[in-house]
Amino acid sequence: MSTTDWNTLLPALPALPAQTRIALHAPTAQALLRARGNFKNLTAAQPEAEVWIIANAQAVQAVVDAPEAMEAALPRVLLCPNTLKNNGLSAPANVQVLPMGAVEALARMQADGWIYIRS
């Protein structure tokens, strides 16, 4: 069994730029749980990075059902208005809703230089 030499595999990776902006896409309840962990880890490692969780599809229902489960990430969660409308849901008072569908928002964010991560 061989060991991986991470210095060879990932040679001298530069630090993330100070203006790093990351969009964590969560389309399922399981992805939402991963996004919460990703958010926690990213903001601990890169406190100056701007990190948002974009929830659509089944992840929206998970946020609506238990917003408190998002813990510290809750102020950085954005819900898809299309999913809310199509499922007859309302966003909790303390949760933000995107001004457009999640897919369009993610496309625009990527075009504007955001890093996309599917959680």
Locate each region found by the language model.
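Secreted/extracellular ectodomain signature
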Residues: 1-119
